[in-house]
């Protein structure tokens, strides 16, 4: 059939996380607390790294960028989810859906590349400690961060450019709570088998490759640390363990969603909630609870703010 005869749908309807009103209220409270904690936790990391001069190192410079990404990434889906949990109708316009997918993959892609840059940073710190500050200069760190965002942009544009030309004539019901490629692609009024393979290659296989590359990289780093001794070795192992935990929590759901045929499974909703809303919360928790230097810096900043407040009152 000629694609010009198709009538493009004007909006999509979400089935949402649950159809139960009672459970919706419970989930609203839980996810609202998670989202607020995500914003405050990541914002606190940003402020601490910016205000504490002894944290002006490449590792914390990159960590601040990750916090910015986590705030933006969670804000792509969480506010809409919270609104829909209290709404009878859960709809989003076609243009709104495309916009959500664009920023979702832009920030998700930048997140993946940023985690790779952080692994490279740890490798240089362990393998070339005497030249670390020279190699990971402020200019180079900035360039790597910009490259991560550009990589996310290219990845997102590739997704959207493949999806936009497709005809969408109905149905318009998405069995999820946000717009993403696997669910939207299934609603196209044409054969999408080849396109699905391209999407799986772009998202899933790349996620697998980067995940294993990062695991191998951190394994090499940990093996290199066997020759180190003292407090520096303990701190380096703690930092690498935190990075490995964050990488695993990010990539396992990502691989589950994108590295398989785009067919709905009963566990999809739970995995998606973990991936989109809860994962950005875990990053600040992991990096602050396991990082004594960060915790000491936060206490120092708190004392400074307290002193400033007393001076203003006087």
UniProtKB/Swiss-Prot annotation:
The chain crosses the membrane at residues 26-49, 58-79, 101-120, 140-158, 196-219, 236-258, 270-289. Keywords: Cell membrane, Disulfide bond, G-protein coupled receptor, Glycoprotein, Membrane, Olfaction, Receptor, Sensory transduction, Transducer, Transmembrane, Transmembrane helix. Odorant receptor. Its main location: membrane. It is a multi-pass membrane protein. GO terms for molecular function: G protein-coupled receptor activity; olfactory receptor activity. Residues 50-57, 121-139, 220-235, 290-314 are cytoplasmic. InterPro entries: GPCR_Rhodpsn (IPR000276), GPCR_Rhodpsn_7TM (IPR017452), Olfact_rcpt (IPR000725), Olfactory_Receptors (IPR050427). The keyword Amino-acid biosynthesis does not apply. GO terms for cellular component: plasma membrane. It comes from Homo sapiens (Human). The keyword Membrane applies. SUPFAM superfamilies: Family A G protein-coupled receptor-like. Belongs to the G-protein coupled receptor 1 family. Glycans are attached at residue 5. Pfam families: 7tm_4. CDD domains: 7tmA_OR4D-like (cd15936). Gene3D superfamilies: Rhodopsin 7-helix transmembrane proteins. Disulfide bonds join 97-189. This is Olfactory receptor 4D9. It is found in: Cell membrane. Residues 1-25, 80-100, 159-195, 259-269 are extracellular.
